[in-house]
Amino acid sequence: MSNFLECKTSVLPLNRVGVELVSTQSRTGLNSSPTLPILCFNLVAISLLVLFFQGVIMANQLKSLFPQKAKDFEKSDQAKIFDRKNLYDYLDGGAELYLAYDFQRLVVQDYKSGETSITVEVYSMETSQDAFGLYSLDQEGEDVQIGDRATYGSGLLKFWKGNYLVRITDMSGNDRFIEAILDLGKNISQNIAPKGKPPELLAKLPADGLVPHSERFFHKQIILNNLYFLSTENLLNLNEKTSAVMGDYLLGKMNLKLLLISYPDTSIAKYAFENFCNRYLKTSLSGNRVIQKVEEGKFAGAELDKKNLWLTFESRDEKATGNFLRNLKKR
C-alpha cells in the first residue's frame, strides 16, 4: 500500500489522466490497484524525458565552448556528439579507457582553412579529478600555459581544465599551424569555468626523484594494466571506489615505478595487500612490508599503511627499495 501511495502522490500533479482514472474508479467502486502500472509508467516516462533534456542541455553547453574561428580557421560541418552509449563509434578499441574515468560526453568540431583541417575534441567527465586522470595518461610534449595543465607537441595540444579534457589536433601532424591551435585552446579554456582541482592523492607522491610528466591517476585495473601489466586477474581489487597514483622515479643509480592505492577502508586494503603478496610476490607475510625478487635482478615491494597500499616495481636494489618504502610510510 505504501508503494502505491508513493507512486500516486508523485505522479498526480503532473498527470491529469491519472487523476481522472483514480477518481472514476473511486466513484464506481472499482479496485484502484490496476492504475499502479499506468501511474508508474508515466513516472518513468517523465524521468526519461528529464534525462533526455538534461543531455540536450549538456550537449549545448559543450558546443558553446567552441569559438566560431581562430586565426584563418573557421568551423566546418556540424559538431558531432557522443555519449557513453555510442563512444565506441568514435573511439573503436579505446573507449574502455575513457569510460573507466566516468566519461559523460564528447563533442568533436572540425575547423578548416583551405584544405587544412584542425580537429577539436572536448571530453566531459563527471569530476575534475577524473578529467585530470584522463589527461595524465598522455602528457608527452612541452608545457604550455593553457587551462589547468597543458602540453603541446607535433601538432597536438592537450589540456585539462575543470571537468574537461581537450585535444586539438592538426591532422597534418606538424607545427605549421601552432598559432591557430594555441589560439583555439586559449579561447576554449576561457569558456570553461571554474578551474579544476587535481586529486589529493597526487600530493602523496614524493617529489624527489619523480620523473616529470610521469604521474598518473586512475581507479580501475584496465588503466593499471595499460600502464604496467600485472595480471589478467584483479589482484589489487581495483574498482570505482579505489583511487590510485603512479609515477616513475630516478633515485641515484636506482630507478623504479611507485604505485599508491587508497582503499575505502583498512580491511579492504589489508585484503588487497595479502592477495598481492600471495598471488604476485608468491611469498608469506611477516609484517606490513614485503620485498621479493620477481625476475632476474629485479625486486617488487609492498607496504601496507592503514587504508593505503604502496607498491614498487622494477627496482634492482633490494636494500634501497626497503629504505624507500620505509620513508614513504612517514609521509
Indicate where each model-derived feature is located:
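Intrinsic disorder/low-complexity segments
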Residues: M1-V50
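Soluble, non-membrane globular domain cores that form compact, hydrophobic packing
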Residues: F53-R331
